[in-house]
Structure formats: structure tokens, C-alpha cells
Regions:
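Secondary-structure transition motif
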Residues: 1-150
């Protein structure tokens, strides 16, 4: 069974955390309307109460920036690091001139699944194990702009 994990950047200190992703509705305040909090939690318990499911216990939660949330692909890079959506991976394995020394952004498409995209080519998940994570689009966007590594 595939491990379902998400990763996001904490609002409090810009630290990356991974775990379960929950969008929690904050209480309604008159005149303010409904608001939502995006959280990553390390443990999640769902209880069934009056035919409604709700989150009963969340021991440790982290508020995260929803723009930074990405899902774990279920795969690891050449160094054994977990590959998440929006990671930047460098392929430099003498595979072919179309992908060697290229930086790929890991993306997800609902119909196609996970894939890596560069400015000139794509890679499929079966190639991920030959790549190395060098950053992500939030912390190291300059790698993506370069497109290739020297």
C-alpha cells in the first residue's frame, strides 16, 4: 500500500513539515464569514458522531501555507530521499542527452499522475529513482529558471 503523506511550509517559521493534510473550517464570526486553516498533522483520529465524521484528536498540528502543500509521490531519489510534488530533481545519470543535466519540477496531473517537467522534456515516475532532489520551487527557484546544471 502506498504511503499517503503531504508536506507544507509552516507559517510560523518557514520550516518544512510532513504528515496528514487537513483543511479545517474555523468558527464563523459575525461579519467575517467562514475561514479555513490548512494544517499538517502527525497523527489523525476520525470519530463518527451522529452520522457525521469529524476530527476528534490531533496531537500535533502545524499551520501551513496552502500554496506550499505537495503530496508525496511514493518514490525516492537516488539518495533515498522522499520525492514530493514541487520538488526539483536533477537527472545526471548518462541516460540520454534529452534529460541529462536537466532540472525537472515534479508535478501532478489528475489524469496522468506524477511526472517531472523541464523546459524541453518530461520524465515519468519510473525515472525518478535516477534523479537527485536539489531543492523545490519555493526555496530554490533559481534552479528551475536555469533549466540545466553546468
Amino acid at each position: 500500500m502506498r504511503e499517503i503523506l503531504f508536506r507544507g511550509k509552516r507559517i510560523a517559521n518557514d520550516e518544512w513539515v510532513s504528515g496528514y493534510y487537513v483543511v479545517r473550517k474555523r468558527p464563523y464570526f459575525k461579519g467575517k464569514g467562514a475561514d479555513f486553516e490548512h494544517i499538517i498533522c502527525d497523527n489523525l483520529v476520525i470519530d463518527d458522531f451522529n452520522d457525521r465524521q469529524f476530527v476528534d484528536t490531533i496531537p500535533i498540528t502545524y499551520s501551513v501555507d496552502p500554496e506550499t502543500v505537495g503530496q508525496y509521490t511514493g518514490l525516492t531519489d537516488v539518495n533515498g530521499n522522499k520525492i514530493f510534488e514541487r520538488d526539483l530533481c536533477l537527472c545526471d545519470r548518462n541516460i540520454s542527452k534529452h534529460i541529462d543535466k536537466k532540472v525537472f519540477e515534479i508535478k501532478f496531473d489528475p489524469e496522468a499522475g506524477f511526472f517531472g517537467e523541464s523546459d524541453t522534456s518530461n520524465i515519468c515516475p519510473s525515472d525518478f529513482y535516477m534523479c537527485e532532489i536539489i531543492g523545490n520551487i519555493f526555496d530554490t527557484p533559481e534552479f528551475l529558471k536555469a533549466g540545466e546544471m553546468p
